[in-house]
Amino acid sequence: MGEEYEVEIGPVAHGGHCIARTSEGQVLFVRHALPGERVLARVTEGEEGARYLRADAVEILDASKDRVEAPCPYAGPGRCGGCDWQHAKPGAQRRLKGEVIAEQLQRLAGLTPEEAGWDGTVMPAEGDKLPAGEVPAWRTRVQYAVDADGNAGLRRHRSHEVEPIEHCMIAAPGVSELGIEERDWSGMESVDAIAATGSQDRMVILEPRPGARLPLVELDKPVSVMRVEEKDGGIHRVHGRAFVRERADGRTYRVGSGGFWQVHPMAADTLVKAVMQGLLPRKGDMALDLYCGVGLFAGALADRLGDKGAVLGIESGKRAVEDARHNLAAFERVRIEQGKVEAVLPRTGITEVDLIVLDPPRAGAGKKTVEQLVSLGARKIAYVACDPAALARDLGYFRDGGYKVRTLRAFDLFPMTHHVECVAILEPAAKGL
């Protein structure tokens, strides 16, 4: 490590870096660079003879027109690993994400953007269209790491080392106003700060180091306090509520500590709108909400299916299932089952459905689950994905099972990072013949 190469930067790759080659043909994955630039790249990971090396652009010799000075003082080689594209204009960030989606669709599913019903654009979330130079403060949940001196900060890229910070520019106002960075967190491994979008609820989750005592938490705003137990890794209440209240599509959702909710304040509404516009639910439909979390899409479906419609949600997390059942208790024809999708589905006895929504974790649904879904003959399927590679792979499985992507929409719900959210709508291929 530490070797330096002067290289021409090639295309963007999945993961927040660009591809380059040394004069000897060695592949470099280079962070802090942009396509078309000439940079001095310093190797940060990998050994001679490896299939590829990781590197940072430590000097820009010929800059792209899309380059800007990173607004965050903690961005750059060897610094905070939270953001990937601080050095790129917002429009360029979205274009790069679109190029990654297109490459993954072609490589893993054999689909062009046109064949996927996608116009190639990545849309910003509402409220993120800001004047030049302004950074969207969107992250409603920030996991701060704590260094040996008790300073809160963020992890450096692919490292356990902590970059102490005074302020995270992409943290939502509700997180920033807690003043996490101003406190001494000695004895803590991490401090997870959550600011709900649909209420004034605030929560911090403290993870103590082995044998450490919990500090007295005095923050700038009222806050619930939870702790991660050393023995079982479970999250337990110390003070206040054990949940926050979020709001989307006109409905309030209880989200327990450790539960999943989209971190961009507009993400839940954006995704519900895209899914419902794609599915066009009808009164009386039977629908599945898979990997349903606290019931976001199940609630949206139930509101639209009427008294004769029905929704089955499946979720593996015990606390998320409890929250989903609480959130949707008013609907007699909504049922939430706990377990892995591929295990629970066969036990339900369901042989056909009208609509399916799946929002799997980053690894995607996988071949076995896709085959199960195809057998149900749904009129439409909405696939919500946070990883273009897993999405593309699974779309290939759906194609093999007789389904075709009718539309695909991409949303920049993680500005400054390489992450992107997609919603694909599928229908039986025979429908288009």
Curated annotation (Swiss-Prot):
Domain of life: Bacteria
Amino acids binding S-adenosyl-L-methionine: Q262, Y291, E315, D359
EC number(s) reported in the record: 2.1.1.-
UniProt KW Transferase keyword: yes
Keyword terms, alphabetized: 4Fe-4S, Iron, Iron-sulfur, Metal-binding, Methyltransferase, S-adenosyl-L-methionine, Transferase
Active site: C386
Main EC class the enzyme belongs to: transferase
GO BP, sorted A to Z: rRNA base methylation
Coiled coil spans: none
Positions of the TRAM domain: 1-59
One of the record's GO molecular function terms: metal ion binding
Residues annotated to bind [4Fe-4S] cluster: C72, C80, C83, C168
Record-linked PANTHER family: RNA M5U METHYLTRANSFERASE (PTHR11061), TRNA (URACIL(54)-C(5))-METHYLTRANSFERASE (PTHR11061:SF30)
Family: Belongs to the class I-like SAM-binding methyltransferase superfamily. RNA M5U methyltransferase family.
Protein name (record): Uncharacterized RNA methyltransferase SAV_2389
Organism listed in the record: Streptomyces avermitilis (strain ATCC 31267 / DSM 46492 / JCM 5070 / NBRC 14893 / NCIMB 12804 / NRRL 8165 / MA-4680)
